[in-house]
């Protein structure tokens, strides 16, 4: 294989890598901003592949003597549209009246059509250069699939967590532009263009490359602007991990944590949430010495648990080390959780909660389950019958489990699905709720795998700002406008809770 053919085959590797990268960026961005990762990735992939098919069909109309020139144009267009896609979508989503979904799928379609034209053009160029057809197909497809493999590994493990979606988009746009420049230079004698036209193409390539380089350099600023517009407050911490996007904002004395764009707490009223989550269970298991926290990487549930001097050990299991590190070291956040992670009674385990429960042998008097809302299947499995059965093996016969369970007012089917799932897993349950102004009416469920009775506490042995005998009594009483609907338990094979959650919140949130 001569040098020109080898370089064209190498271009296939880069083209395939970039094409899959834009698909992954669009899917990840849609999941981050719109939720429901299964639906978003499925629809993005379907639209992208359909558009690639259109592009492959359209490529037949490119004249043989214009293949190289059109390939250069394609690479510049793919680099431009693909490179700016993440930044443009981030900024667009922050505009309330913007047609985000329309623009998202329009971009996916345009990029898909352009990418779909690339490989057929390369194959035709190689065929015209006397490459044997059987060798041509095998080499092109081999490097096509190798490029896809490389990006499918690098994107979730390195690129997205270290560079972020916006900078990753610009990086791959630069790769497409580099292929265009290299093709323009190496095959300049075969382009069949005048020096003036070649100069115009080089000028266009330079402009696209300069724009993408500027975007790459300004990626953090662009992300900050878009998230500032989205959240409305000053951003004091913004971290991308392999698992999620963490953003902490501040307005006056109000600190707020967002995970993948969803509010997790406001420092103005989080004490209501965390007192309601933790204190009824710990007051009801008077001799609780060992406590398990699943999730809760902000340390705010820990703060409430550590008020009890009889608690000897707390194990906190949170998937994301970036989360627990942030709330262990950032000054304002450490002050909020009152240095909970520095308490010698606390052990932090950064692991998947389900996998940790399968291997651990520890037993606990109280288990606090404070996972994010079940907005996708990866979180929904942590609200399933098998998970709760696994958890019950680690709770003492007289112990209690408490679970944050979304809103019984805004998401009634989701809330009562958690209750039904716990019952299906063999627990007795005592549902309750509390008003948290930043969330609205929020729900929790106390559950016991062994004990048969529970009475809401009438006094608290630790200082409280929200709970007393009256508020506790009210928490365990449901008004007529929060009835229990008919729901099915959440099992791994149906993930009904994720469906309920999406349907309940549709129309409540954007």
Swiss-Prot record:
S-methyl-5'-thioadenosine binds at residues 244, 318, 352-353. It catalyses: S-adenosyl 3-(methylsulfanyl)propylamine + putrescine = S-methyl-5'-thioadenosine + spermidine + H(+). It is found in: Cell membrane. Its EC number is 2.5.1.16. GO terms for cellular component: plasma membrane. It is a multi-pass membrane protein. Residues 205-449 form the PABS domain. Residues 207-456 are annotated as: Spermidine synthase. Catalyzes the irreversible transfer of a propylamine group from the amino donor S-adenosylmethioninamine (decarboxy-AdoMet) to putrescine (1,4-diaminobutane) to yield spermidine. PANTHER family: THERMOSPERMINE SYNTHASE ACAULIS5. Homodimer or homotetramer. This is Polyamine aminopropyltransferase 2. It comes from Ralstonia nicotianae (strain ATCC BAA-1114 / GMI1000).
